Amino acid sequence: AGVATISGGNLERCRAQGKLVNLEMRLEQQPLNGMIGIGHTRWATHGAPTERNAHPHIVDGIAVVHNGIIENFAELKAELEATGADFETSTDSEVVAHLLAK
């Protein structure tokens, strides 16, 4: 699970593996500053259910959460990597953030 907020034009993100209560505990320890944000609880379809793969994905100031499957993500990822995109996760959803950042 994860959440991203915006404060003063900057994105902040907090993610945690497992149950939503894990994210809640992390946010209690390290609160985010923003008052507007997006969040997601993830059911892994591509990529392991790890903190690194948790949404939101952030690329160049764009935060993305996604529910669903991107069928052609391998092809899109390869095309983006060929143009210099650096992927942090093994999820299909991260391609959306990279495409929007282009």
Curated annotation (Swiss-Prot):
Cited SUPFAM superfamilies: N-terminal nucleophile aminohydrolases (Ntn hydrolases)
GO biological process: fructose 6-phosphate metabolic process; protein N-linked glycosylation; UDP-N-acetylglucosamine metabolic process
Pfam family, one: GATase_6
Catalytic activity: D-fructose 6-phosphate + L-glutamine = D-glucosamine 6-phosphate + L-glutamate
Entries under InterPro entries matching the protein: GATase_2_dom, Ntn_hydrolases_N
Listed GO MF terms: glutamine-fructose-6-phosphate transaminase (isomerizing) activity
Function noted in UniProt: Involved in the production of the root hair deformation (HAD) factor specifically on medicago.
Name of the protein: Glutamine--fructose-6-phosphate aminotransferase [isomerizing]
Species this protein is from: Rhizobium leguminosarum bv. trifolii
